[in-house]
Amino acid sequence: MSIQDVKNYLPHRYPFLLIDRVLELEIGKSIVALKNVTFNEPQFTGHFPEQPIMPGVMIVEALAQATGILAFKSEAGKPIDGQIYMLVGIDKVRFKRMVEPGDQLRLEVEVITIKRGIWKFKCKATVDNQIITSAELMCTQRTAG
C-alpha cells in the first residue's frame, strides 16, 4: 500500500501520520509497514536538539497505527465510514535501542486474538533487523466523533 492508500485507512495526518508504506498485509492475520524517520519531524526540535531520539511513545503509536490498518482492512471498513480504531491497552512494552533520524522502522504486527470486539496484537519494531520495541497492543472499533 502506498501512502495514498494508507491515508484511506487512517484518520491521522501530518504530523501524526506515522505509517509511510505497507509492505505486506494478510487479512485477519498480520501486517508489515514502514516508518521512515527524518530529522524534519517536529518531535526532534525538543527530543533532544543535540541528540535527536524518536520518543518511545511515538514508536508505540506507529505500531498502533499499523494495527488500525490491519483491523480496518480485515473488517472491510474505513474511517470515512464513521468508524475509528482506538488503542485501549498496552502490555509488555520493551524498548531495546534508540531510534534516530535516518532510521527506517519496520513495524510488524500479528493478531493474537479477537474477543468481544477487542483486538489483541503482538507487535515489534525493528531497524536493520534489530528489535527496537516489542509490545502487545489492544484496540477496539468506535464510532468517530
Curated annotation (Swiss-Prot):
It is found in: Cytoplasm. It is an enzyme of class 4 (lyase). InterPro entries: FabA_FabZ (IPR013114), FabZ (IPR010084), HotDog_dom_sf (IPR029069). GO terms for molecular function: (3R)-hydroxyacyl-[acyl-carrier-protein] dehydratase activity. SUPFAM superfamilies: Thioesterase/thiol ester dehydrase-isomerase. GO terms for biological process: fatty acid biosynthetic process; lipid A biosynthetic process. Its EC number is 4.2.1.59. The active site is at 47. It comes from the Bacteria. The keyword Lyase applies. Keywords: Cytoplasm, Lipid A biosynthesis, Lipid biosynthesis, Lipid metabolism, Lyase. Transmembrane segments: none annotated. Gene3D superfamilies: Hotdog Thioesterase. Pfam families: FabA. Its main location: cytoplasm. It catalyses: a (3R)-hydroxyacyl-[ACP] = a (2E)-enoyl-[ACP] + H2O. GO terms for cellular component: cytoplasm; membrane. Belongs to the thioester dehydratase family. FabZ subfamily. Involved in unsaturated fatty acids biosynthesis. Catalyzes the dehydration of short chain beta-hydroxyacyl-ACPs and long chain saturated and unsaturated beta-hydroxyacyl-ACPs. This is 3-hydroxyacyl-[acyl-carrier-protein] dehydratase FabZ. It comes from Ruthia magnifica subsp. Calyptogena magnifica. The lineage of its organism: Bacteria, Pseudomonadati, Pseudomonadota, Gammaproteobacteria, Candidatus Pseudothioglobaceae.
